[in-house]
Amino acid sequence: VNRSIASGVFSVVSVKVVVQLLTALSTPLLYRFLGPSKYGDYAFLLSVFAIYMIFVSSGVTDGVRKFLAEDRNDANWSEHVVGFYFRLAIGLAAVGAFLLILAARLGIVDRAFGDGFAIYFYALAALVVTAQFRDYARKTLMGFGLERYSEPLKILDTVSFIVVAIPLAYVGVGVMGVLAGHLVASLLVAVAGLAIVNRRVPLTCLSSTPTERFPRKQMLTFNTMSIVLVFLLMSLYHIDIVMLQRFRTSADVGNYKAALTLAEFLWFVPLAIQTVFVHSTSELWSQNRRRKISKLASRATRYTFLLTAVMAVGLAALADIAVPIYFGDEAVPAIEPLLLLLPGALGFALARPILAVSQGKGNLRYPIAATGVAALLNVVLNAALIPRYGMHGAAVATSIGYGTMFVCHCWSARRVGFDPLADARLARAALTTVLAAAPIIALATVITNPWFALAVVPPVGFVIFVGFALLVGALDPSEPFEILSVFPDPIGSRAAAIQVSFEGEGDEDGETRSWLQSLLFVAGLSLFVSGLALGILGTGIQSLLP
């Protein structure tokens, strides 16, 4: 993987790990302090807001990130791009906030969603403005390649939200207190982010007039296509919540949202790759380096499969333990929807890097078509299954919609001009998952102490998974060290040295055993480890623990 891209991914992943940890700590507190019903109302409001903000901010944020990253020789290119999108951001935010206030004042909100929701939409109107400039500032910094600034702003956003929202929820302010947390956090990030942007490009460029050669039409066309794409993506995220609110109680919505939250934890690495790849591959596309792009995309697909699969297997093995501990006993109904969502979450994770590379080219026709097929299937299935099966139907429909994304975007990628499966090794990655799942689930089964299971199963399961990945060839021996080489020293330098030594020994004489022999060997090893866990370890662990 290109080192600059890898370091960019590492920067984003590092921050996402921190944000995920903070979110993981705050989410169960919100669930407990609000209760399932109010948490369901909060989840519903966020889903409506996310869909609404597509039309307010998506064209701005995606556009400024893409066009700033392009290597153009036009005079004052960066200033003109920043100014163009800043003006657009101001106008769209003003219109977006006004329309929400108008809908609340005219009673449209109460008629559509029920009494009591109008007050929340006044808060959402203010959030439209602050969220618009928060996202504009962060994506502008990313367009400049300044992830070292843009990503810590996410930590500021999360910490500020927690500091405000959790105490307000605890003292009984309810959903409005949590929305106030979002408002304060986004305002702080917007101010800090715009101050950093101003150091790179003075925001007085707001009043500058670009030349006639400035590609306004191309930018607006990209904005329109980007809005369509993001709308389709967001429908996959949120249409199930919106539909479930119509047919089931707020408590069901809250528990289903709890299941979604855990399933979406699988996406933090794929999201980081997607975030960096959009602007990192734009330059490769401008240089027409298709072979490099295919190599990059297929390896990203393989790494995403392996990382997401091991997390999915671990979460499935520990679901009965993790959900009640994490959210409380009231969230036990979320366990089955969570298990139904995991296969689809894996498929969606695989689609993310592929979509990002396609976005980097700027031609969104095929990605939109691919996403549209998955989104349409998702809407149809949710409409068919939710009225009868509730949150279980929503989970099945959403999982199928998510999984379809990977298939559709593989087709889209070939149309765009790259092959995301060139070095993906999907069969070997799938075999790794199946073989490793048996001992991991067996280990989780035999450990009866829940806290001990949470401490032991994830690290041991990861080692088992990586071992099988190396045995079946889903990973080359040097690749784990190649990934570690982008970490700070001393880890990075030592991993790089080990990687070089492995690559020096990596001649093409490795096929000494047939594939069938290797398959039989690893299958036998999987059964052996499973039997060991169920037999010897089961007796030993249960004798040591209460």
Question: What residues fall within each predicted segment?
Answer:
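Signature of the first transmembrane helix
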Residues: 3-61, 93, 97, 101, ...
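Helix-loop junctions and terminal segments of transmembrane helices
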Residues: 56-73, 143, 263-304, 308, ...
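Membrane-proximal transmembrane or re-entrant/amphipathic helices at the cytosolic face
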Residues: 442-546
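Membrane-interface junctions at transmembrane-helix termini in multi-pass inner-membrane proteins
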Residues: 129-154, 176, 342-374
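Hydrophobic alpha-helical transmembrane segments
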Residues: 122, 153-202, 260, 373-378, ...
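Interhelical loop/hinge segments that connect adjacent transmembrane helices in multipass membrane
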Residues: 172-175, 179, 193-237, 280, ...
